[in-house]
Structure formats: structure tokens, C-alpha cells
Amino acid sequence: MCVAALSGAFTFYNIMPWNEGREEESARDMVEYVERTGNPICLYSLPMHAEGRPAMTRAMRMIESYRKVRRLVEGTPVKLGVLLQSTLGHWSRVDREIEPWQRTVRIDGTEARFCPLDPGFQNYIREAVRLLAAEKPVMIMGDDDIRGYSGGKLECFCPLHVKAFNKANGTHFTSEQLREAVENGKEGDPILEAFVRLHRKTVCDFARLIRAAIDSVDPAIPAAACMPGMAWEQKWSPLTAKALAAKGQEPILRMGNSQYGEILHNFSELTSRSLRTMAFFSLHGDGMCLLDESDSFPQNQWSKSGTTLHSKLVSSIFLGARGSKIWYVNAHKSGGIPVSRVYTDVLARFRGFYPALAEAVKGTDPAGVISPAHPRFPLGAGAMCDTHTLADGIFGTMGIPYRCDVHLERDGAYVLSGEMAVEGFSDAELDLMLSHRILVDADAAVALTKRGFSGKTGVSAAFDPSLKFKEDYFDAGGFPMYFTAVRKPAARFDCAAGVEEFSHLVFVDPETGKRDPVTPSGVKFANSLGGTVVTVAYSTEQYWAYLHSEQRRDYFHYVLGLLGPDALGYALMNPQPAQCLARRGKERDLVAVFNFCPDPMRSVLLKCPVRPKSVRRLGDDGVWKPCAFREIGAGVFEIDDEIPCCGAPVYRIDSGMAY
């Protein structure tokens, strides 16, 4: 069973709020939503975490509300399902009356949610899910509280878990002792690894309990999971999705890639969300239907934008998403307050666009410089990929395509940016990357020097507080750029024999104007591993104004060119902040442009690796429409298409003669 069979090539799961006493209003909202958008699936959101005593009293109120809505939408196009919005619960329990079940104990010793090992709590969840399954929902989706932490703190160290841990490992820990051992454990520590196994088993067993309750009624009902926000659970959240899936059903997992705030000043954060989405696809994309976590939750009137909701959807579908979990579109919140219908308008306008884009992505592969992802990081810390680095922070706003990959053996041009990125990789992984073609920034160069890799980069790098100069790359046919060190000093390079220097930090004599080189700021080195390493004295930990300029963009075009003709590929040449994503195929290429500037792009200036035969833009209705274009420079083409602020057009480029 494939998720596409539920709705189409791209499936929306619209979460509708529990609306006790206003079920007729909810049913009308759902019918209107389906008729306008063509998206039939609505999941009624039920916060099933146990509250009150007996907890089933509140649960039965929600189940009865679901039954009323189900009866009201019978005979309509609505396909009704359930979001188990909270089972374990997102937060600590604060009820006045509470069931006498075991509470989870977090790593700081505080109590939080009900423990999934408690038999009474298990019986409650089993019965509630069984009753919901009897209503024949089209889908049951578990929310992201099915996880092993709450409030950002690791669980569980309660008496039930400590007993299970000691029995499995032949130990005699108390809760306090186990918490201390886990908190101080390092990678490879047998106690830490044993706890991680129990931690994972607890979450997966809870998902299996839900699946078993569904199966006791109807094994054919599909179910899905939502990825939690903590990176160390994101690594193995596909296991939860597999545990929830029906037999023969493709596992469905909503990614944790939302920014939850659609207003303009957050829009450029789309680059870091794009990078994270790329990492999820690289790590979990095979055999898993990944859904976008879309930014439609209506927090308040200052955070709503259907335009940027659409742009986020475009980026995720372009990267491979096959569905989306959206919140409260066309609904009413508590008190009868209508959710902004701008979300409905956008989904109605683009109802043909989203499935057409999902179909077009098939048969193409992500293109651009590779930012490596690392699934190895400490329990409770780190992330699969570092953000606000050269890839998403600089290239993502300079129109230079990038991608993220966890498979470091893959050939291509890499970029290693930031000290934390280096710390996340083993020596063997760093060797593998340095055997490719790779761009290294100042922070990564200093970190590699500390790790003993200077012999493989050709550079011994250290930050030098005395360096605050202009930067020259006249030798590369360029021009001077201002180089400032407000937040972090520049890096000084001591270069090995055989290193090619192509730019320098220079001191400008105040009397003569003579430019004297102080240290190389851009070097190229062919190492013993067979790799080509280009290192630049450029840190991303500076002010935005000093990080971005047309000169700096041209500099990086030149630098990437040193890594081979395929390192750059497509690139946006407009003099304003924008993200450019690219995919390459045998017969066609796809390019998506995201305008981050409040000013429109009057036309699209696109550097192309080959001369286009034709350029088409995907219309709102899902039909590819031809665009006029002309060559304005070597390999640069002007496409007659205006992009408004936050616009996100997708172009299909059919290629002809290569340059």
C-alpha cells in the first residue's frame, strides 16, 4: 500500500482541531476545504494524553466528537482520519486529578509524562486506539510526542526503566546512578549504548502497542509517524514509522523540517530548512514516504503568510517530499475563531501545481555543491547537518545551488564549513571527504589543523587577531573586496610546498596606496589522497552585510570553478538575495528560484552549464508554460519572468549544445 493511493501523486494531510460541541461547523469546514483544494484527507486532532481520573472519561468525549464528525461527512468527498495529537504527551502532566500511573523521570531527575512501560497507561492507550480504529479512519497518524524525551530532556530513568535496564545488562544501578552514567557517557561506552538500545526499544514498543490495537480491529488501516525535533531521535525515527505501518504499507514519516513562523523576516531561514530537508532525504529517503512539515500553524495574526507557506512547500517537494502535514487549513479554532482563509486560497490556487511538481522531480537527482551530513553525534546534542554555514548561509542566498549528503563516498564537489562540522566527523570520514574535490572555509581549516590534517589540506591555519585587511584576488582576474573581522579575526595560512595561491589578504599603505600581501586567503592543493582541496580564509561568523556582496559571489564562482566545471552548474546571477536549487536529469533539468528580497526580480538571470533548447515555467495549474529567454553573456541567460517577493517559480530546462 502506497500513500499516493490515498489521495494522488502528492498527498496533503490537513489537521483539523478537536471541536467539541461545534462538530457541524468542523464538518462544513472540511467539506469546503476538500471542494476548494481537491485534497480529500482531513485528520481530526485528538490530544489523547491521559488527563483526569479516570482518564477514559475525557478520551470518550473526544471519541464521541470524532463519531459525530464522521457521521456528518458521510457521503461527502472528505476522507476522515485521526491525528493522535498526543499520546505520551508533549509536556509534563499538570492535572489536578491524575491516574496513579508511573511518571517518566528525566535525566535531571524531574518527573514528566506517563511512562509507556506502565501497564495501566498501556491499557488506556490500547483501549482508546481500539475504539478509534473501530470508526474506520482513513489514516491514524501519531504525533511527534511519541519520543523518548520531554521538554528537551532525555527519558526515562523511572523505577520501571531502571529495573528493565538492570535486568537486561546484569547491573545494579539506581536511577540517580544511571542518570549520571548516561550524562557522562561517551561514544562507545557500553552503559551509554545499552541505555540507547532501551531508549529506542521503549519508543518502538509503544508504537507497536498502537499498531496492535489498530490490528485488533482492522489490520488494513494505514498509520504514520511524525519525526521529533531532537536530532538524536531523528536518526532513528524511521523505526517508529515502520512499527506503526500496516502490513504491506509503505512507512510514512513526517519530517521535522518546519520553521513555524511564516513572516518575511524568517523567510531566509528557508535555506537552513532546505539543508535539513536534504539531510533527511539522504539518510531516510530510501523505502520511506517522507512528508513535509508545513508552516501553516496559525500561532497569531503576526505569523501568517500563505505565500511563504507555498514557497516552503515548493522547496520540500523539489527536494523529494511526497506529501505534507498541514495544520488547521479552513478550520475554526476554539471559540469559533476562523483560521485565515489565505491558506485555503493558496492550496486552491496551486491544486494542480503540487502534484505536477512531485511528478516532475521523478527521474532527476539533486545537483550542486555537497554539504556533508553526519548522523554521528552525542546523545542529546548535535544535528545531522550544521546550518548557517557556507552552503545554506552564503550559497543559499547568493543563488548558488547546494545539496546535503550523508553518503560521503559519493563523487562530487564538497564544501566543509564551520568548526562544528569538522568535530562531527571521524578521521576516516574526513580522509574520505579530502579524497574528493572540496572547498574548506577558515573555521573548518583551523579545526582541521588542530586535528592534524594540515598535510592533507596543504595549509596550517590559525586565527590571527592582527589581521583586518582588504582581500585581493587580482591574480584570478578579479578585484579587491573588503574583508572585516568584527566578530572573528581572519585566518593566517602557512602553506606547504606545491600549494597554489590565488588570493591574499593585503595591507594598503596609507601613503602610497601600495598593496602588500600579508597572508594567502585562497589556496589550492592536490593532496596524497588524490583529492583537490581549496581553502579560503573566510568565516561565516561575521555580520550579514560583510558576508554578502556581488564581488563575493563572483569570488565563490571562481573558487568553485577550481574544483571542476561541474562544481557550479546552474547559478542565479541576479543582484539580490535568493536561493537557487537544481536537479539534473537525462532529458531535462529543473531549477527552483526563491526570491528573499522585498523587491521583485524583473527577470531571471541564470548561468547554465549547457545552452538551453527551451525554458518552461510550471504554472499554477500544473501545466508547463514556455518562457522567452536570451543569452546576455557567456553561459548566462535572461528569462523573461518576474518573481515577486517570496516567489518560488520552478523552471524546466531542456538542454541542447554544451559550451
PLM-predicted stretches and their roles:
Residues 37, 45-46, 149, 217-390, ...:
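Hydrophobic targeting/anchoring helices
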Residues 387, 392-393, 406-407, 415-659:
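A conserved amphipathic helix/loop scaffold
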Residues 9-22, 48-63, 107-126, 188-204, ...:
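The substrate-binding groove and active-site-proximal loops of carbohydrate-active enzymes
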Residues 6-20, 79-87, 141-145, 192-237, ...:
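Aromatic-lined carbohydrate-recognition surfaces of secreted/lumenal glycan-active proteins
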Residues 24-51, 131-139, 251-252, 311-323, ...:
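Catalytic domains of carbohydrate-active enzymes, especially glycoside hydrolases
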Residues 64, 79-135, 144, 148, ...:
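Active-site-adjacent "subsite" loops/lids of carbohydrate-active enzymes
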Residues 19-35, 119-132, 236-243, 305-316:
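Short, acidic/polar
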